[in-house]
């Protein structure tokens, strides 16, 4: 510390000619750069009075000169960065002599320039109409919009108050537990005031709980540029409300629900596929309602060979193959279920486009076949597993055919199978070796 103080005194006694002209800018206010006896020792050539140096400036002036002597090509910003890091690493005891020197310079500066007042550099002039709005806080300027140019800060405050009132109106019906209709009414009422200065954006209605009550309306203020998005937000609100209203009344649950078999989450929310019935299905078309379908399925499952009369239609007619005789009793639940599904859906209202019907039928058949394994295994121990596997495999085989069924009945398909493929399909599905299933061309 003593050595630093001595070096500081030695630096202060250096003549001006020994100084570099490049660092004269940093030393214009130091006693080293100018003779302290000169009354203008801290003035620039233009007459601007410089601020007195603080402790860091006193220290960095000395260290900067050392660095510039060692590496004159180093950039000025890099020198400042290194000096800042080194100053932070200095201990407080090492900073004391520089703090004292800075205090001495400050007192001298006050004595020499008693009328000095720190005036920072003025920023570039902005547009005069934008000055009042620039003085507002960001919240007020965002809510007030053009209130700054119209009436200054007071205008911005007024519009922010008015917009908060509007937001309160929106929140009132939501807090009262109103349903989606009340939320829509509040929204349309507030969108009517198109002449207001504020911008109201992104209203969202999110249903809390299971019902439609307790909708919360969020009010978010955006910039002026988002005026065009109001119509989109209104559309988003209606779209988000419609699924909430649909949740209250899931249709056609009682039609598809057998006692203790089908969980409610597997049900579809729209109608069963309306499939036009083919003439060959007239034997089972007498079943009028969906509730009686499951009785027929169970009766067919217990009778075995009796249900086998419908067996030959189910999927084997598509490939023009005769089923193996062992699978006749086992396939009866699946076949009767597929036939009854098509007949019940044909007894509904008029069918829509055939493409949608094919998609719906794919879902219903896959659902029925996956459940036929459970019902069959309960009543037929031996053949139930084979029925489930065979029916599921047949569904996988013919999914592509369902999407093609646009003419006539969905069950009248052309034969797309090659003889080799038909032979494999008609054969045993449970192969002993996996290598038998691999195709080699």
Curated annotation (Swiss-Prot):
<feature type="region of interest" description="Disordered">
    <location>
        <begin position="240"/>
        <end position="292"/>
    </location>
</feature>
<dbReference type="GO" id="GO:2001111">
    <property type="term" value="P:positive regulation of lens epithelial cell proliferation"/>
</dbReference>
<dbReference type="GO" id="GO:0014009">
    <property type="term" value="P:glial cell proliferation"/>
</dbReference>
<feature type="compositionally biased region" description="Low complexity">
    <location>
        <begin position="170"/>
        <end position="186"/>
    </location>
</feature>
<dbReference type="InterPro" id="IPR017386">
    <property type="entry name" value="SOX-12/11/4"/>
</dbReference>
<dbReference type="InterPro" id="IPR036910">
    <property type="entry name" value="HMG_box_dom_sf"/>
</dbReference>
<feature type="compositionally biased region" description="Low complexity">
    <location>
        <begin position="252"/>
        <end position="267"/>
    </location>
</feature>
<dbReference type="GO" id="GO:0048593">
    <property type="term" value="P:camera-type eye morphogenesis"/>
</dbReference>
<dbReference type="GO" id="GO:0001228">
    <property type="term" value="F:DNA-binding transcription activator activity, RNA polymerase II-specific"/>
</dbReference>
<dbReference type="GO" id="GO:0050769">
    <property type="term" value="P:positive regulation of neurogenesis"/>
</dbReference>
<feature type="region of interest" description="Required for transcriptional activation activity and synergistic coactivation of transcriptional activity with POU3F2">
    <location>
        <begin position="409"/>
        <end position="441"/>
    </location>
</feature>
<feature type="region of interest" description="Disordered">
    <location>
        <begin position="319"/>
        <end position="359"/>
    </location>
</feature>
<keyword id="KW-0225">Disease variant</keyword>
<dbReference type="GO" id="GO:0048704">
    <property type="term" value="P:embryonic skeletal system morphogenesis"/>
</dbReference>
<dbReference type="GO" id="GO:0048557">
    <property type="term" value="P:embryonic digestive tract morphogenesis"/>
</dbReference>
<feature type="DNA-binding region" description="HMG box">
    <location>
        <begin position="49"/>
        <end position="117"/>
    </location>
</feature>
<dbReference type="Pfam" id="PF00505">
    <property type="entry name" value="HMG_box"/>
</dbReference>
<keyword id="KW-0539">Nucleus</keyword>
<feature type="compositionally biased region" description="Low complexity">
    <location>
        <begin position="328"/>
        <end position="355"/>
    </location>
</feature>
<keyword id="KW-0010">Activator</keyword>
<dbReference type="GO" id="GO:0045666">
    <property type="term" value="P:positive regulation of neuron differentiation"/>
</dbReference>
<dbReference type="GO" id="GO:0060022">
    <property type="term" value="P:hard palate development"/>
</dbReference>
<dbReference type="GO" id="GO:0000978">
    <property type="term" value="F:RNA polymerase II cis-regulatory region sequence-specific DNA binding"/>
</dbReference>
<dbReference type="GO" id="GO:0035332">
    <property type="term" value="P:positive regulation of hippo signaling"/>
</dbReference>
<dbReference type="GO" id="GO:0021510">
    <property type="term" value="P:spinal cord development"/>
</dbReference>
<dbReference type="GO" id="GO:0045778">
    <property type="term" value="P:positive regulation of ossification"/>
</dbReference>
<feature type="region of interest" description="Disordered">
    <location>
        <begin position="116"/>
        <end position="216"/>
    </location>
</feature>
<dbReference type="GO" id="GO:0002089">
    <property type="term" value="P:lens morphogenesis in camera-type eye"/>
</dbReference>
<dbReference type="GO" id="GO:0060425">
    <property type="term" value="P:lung morphogenesis"/>
</dbReference>
<dbReference type="GO" id="GO:0050672">
    <property type="term" value="P:negative regulation of lymphocyte proliferation"/>
</dbReference>
<dbReference type="GO" id="GO:0003151">
    <property type="term" value="P:outflow tract morphogenesis"/>
</dbReference>
<feature type="compositionally biased region" description="Gly residues">
    <location>
        <begin position="143"/>
        <end position="156"/>
    </location>
</feature>
<dbReference type="GO" id="GO:0003357">
    <property type="term" value="P:noradrenergic neuron differentiation"/>
</dbReference>
<keyword id="KW-0805">Transcription regulation</keyword>
<keyword id="KW-0217">Developmental protein</keyword>
<dbReference type="InterPro" id="IPR050140">
    <property type="entry name" value="SRY-related_HMG-box_TF-like"/>
</dbReference>
<dbReference type="GO" id="GO:2000648">
    <property type="term" value="P:positive regulation of stem cell proliferation"/>
</dbReference>
<dbReference type="GO" id="GO:0005634">
    <property type="term" value="C:nucleus"/>
</dbReference>
<keyword id="KW-0597">Phosphoprotein</keyword>
<dbReference type="GO" id="GO:0030513">
    <property type="term" value="P:positive regulation of BMP signaling pathway"/>
</dbReference>
<dbReference type="GO" id="GO:0061303">
    <property type="term" value="P:cornea development in camera-type eye"/>
</dbReference>
<dbReference type="GO" id="GO:0060253">
    <property type="term" value="P:negative regulation of glial cell proliferation"/>
</dbReference>
């Amino acid at each position: 510390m003593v050595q630093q103080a001595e070096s500081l005194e030695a630096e202060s006694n250096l003549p001006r000619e020994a100084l570099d002209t490049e660092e004269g800018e940093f030393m214009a206010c130091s006693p080293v750069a100018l003779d302290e006896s000169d009354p203008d020792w801290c003035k620039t050539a233009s007459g601007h009075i410089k601020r007195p140096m603080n402790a860091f400036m006193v220290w960095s002036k000395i260290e900067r000169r050392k660095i510039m002597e060692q590496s004159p090509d180093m950039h000025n910003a890099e020198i400042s960065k290194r000096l800042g890091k080194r100053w932070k690493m200095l201990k407080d005891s090492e900073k004391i002599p520089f703090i004292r020197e800075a205090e001495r310079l400050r007192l001298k500066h006050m004595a020499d320039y008693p009328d000095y007042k720190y005036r920072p550099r003025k920023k570039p002039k902005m547009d005069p109409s934008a000055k009042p709005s620039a003085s507002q806080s960001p919240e007020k300027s965002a809510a007030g919009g053009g209130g700054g140019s119209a009436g200054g800060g007071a205008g911005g405050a007024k519009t922010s108050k008015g917009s908060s009132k509007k937001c309160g109106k929106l929140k009132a019906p939501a807090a009262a537990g109103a349903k989606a209709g009340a939320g829509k009414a509040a929204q349309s009422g507030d969108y009517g005031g198109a002449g207001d200065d504020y911008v109201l954006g992104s209203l969202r209605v999110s249903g809390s709980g299971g019902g439609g009550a307790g909708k919360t309306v969020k009010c978010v203020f955006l910039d002026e540029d988002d005026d065009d998005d109001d119509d989109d937000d209104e559309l988003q609100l209606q779209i988000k409300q419609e699924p909430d209203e649909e949740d209250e009344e899931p249709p056609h649950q009682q039609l598809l629900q057998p006692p203790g078999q089908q969980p409610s989450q597997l049900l579809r929310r729209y109608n069963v596929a309306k499939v036009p019935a083919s003439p060959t299905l007239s034997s089972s078309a007498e079943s009028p309602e969906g509730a009686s379908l499951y009785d027929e399925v169970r009766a067919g499952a217990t009778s075995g060979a009796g249900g086998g009369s419908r067996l030959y239609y189910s999927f084997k007619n598509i490939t023009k193959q005769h089923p193996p005789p062992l699978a006749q009793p086992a396939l009866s639940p699946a076949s009767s279920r597929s036939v009854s599904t098509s007949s019940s859906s044909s007894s509904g209202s008029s069918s829509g486009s055939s493409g949608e019907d094919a998609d719906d039928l794919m879902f219903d058949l896959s659902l029925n076949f996956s459940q036929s394994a459970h019902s069959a295994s309960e009543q037929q121990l031996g053949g139930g597993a084979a029925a489930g596997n065979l029916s599921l495999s047949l569904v996988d085989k013919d999914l592509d055919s369902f999407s093609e069924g646009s003419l006539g009945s969905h069950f009248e398909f052309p034969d797309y199978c090659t003889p080799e493929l038909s032979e494999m399909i008609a054969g045993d599905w449970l192969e002993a070796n996996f290598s038998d299933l691999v195709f080699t061309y």
